[in-house]
Every structure is written in structure tokens, then in C-alpha cells.
Amino acid sequence: MRTDIINYLKNEIYERASKPSNKFGIGCYYHIEAVAKNAEILAKKFEADEEIVIISAWLHDIASITDYSLYELHHIHGANIAENILKQFNYEEKKINKVKECILNHRGSINNAKLSIEEKCVADADAISHFDSIPSLMYLAYVNKHMNIDEGRNFVVEKLKRSYNKLSDSSKEFYKDKYDNAMSVL
């Protein structure tokens, strides 16, 4: 396990997320941290390459927090940024390509085929991470979007439903209790 790369990425992502130029705010760091945590869990459960999955999870949104103008195509720009970073660590080209594929195919809003188990782990971890940040979603609804109680609740419920529906079938089964528990509270 390349802990040198992972530790560097944790710090680098935190630094980038902390900058005033990051339009998503520091909350984006906690989203990425939750993605990395869930990605590691899924990698173990589905016997994926943990190193590839964890590194990909830390890098999956790097373009978005680096430059907001890259957001729409952040999966493409992020793969390129990841390659540049990983080359600085003399990371194997074959592994760099696997990380790039995970980043290119992590977006649930873009229906790219997720061919490898590593790609599925990262995409599913990205979707399920919203269940680990419900307070952030509520803050977004009530503070940033100025919604009333019912509008905010519906906003959060619909976001969580969309996220859950983006999961692979195996991850839906794995996270069903988490989904049911969140919905019962909301």
C-alpha cells in the first residue's frame, strides 16, 4: 500500500479544499474523506485493489476543488491532474491508468460503463457518501438555498434517493440498512 501517496493526497486535498477559490467550500473535503472511507470498505467487501480504490477516491473530485471552471468535465480534468501527481511519485503506469479509469467513470450523472470492480467501488462510494453528510445537505438546503422545513426535507430526501439509485445492485444490498435508517428519520 502506497501510504506515502495516500498521506500526501489527504493533505493536498485538504489544502485545495481550504482555499477561498474553492467554490464548494471546506465541506467538499469531508465529502471526499467520506468517499475514501466508503471506497476502502467496498474494496475490502468486493475484493478490489484497495490501493487503486483509495487513491482514486481521494483524487476523484480534485479538478472541481482546484478550479470551478473545470466542474462540468471534472472527471476528465481530474484524471489528467491525477496522472501528473502520481507520476511525481513514480507510480506505475499501469496503476495510473487504473486510477484514471476510476476517476473518468465515477460520476453517477454520466452513464459511463464501470467495467472494473475498482471503478464500481469508487462510483458507489461517491454516491453513498451523501448518507454520511446529511447535516451538510441540510445546511445546503436551509442556509444556502433558504428553503423552508418541508422544501429542505424534500430536497435532502430526493438527493439521497438519487444517490442510492446510482449504486450498483451489490452496493444497494450492502447499504440498504443505511438507506432505510436515513429515510426513517427524514
Sequence positions of predicted segments:
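Short coil-to-beta-strand
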Residues: 4-9, 48-56
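Short, well-structured alpha-helical segments
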Residues: 29, 33, 54, 93-104, ...
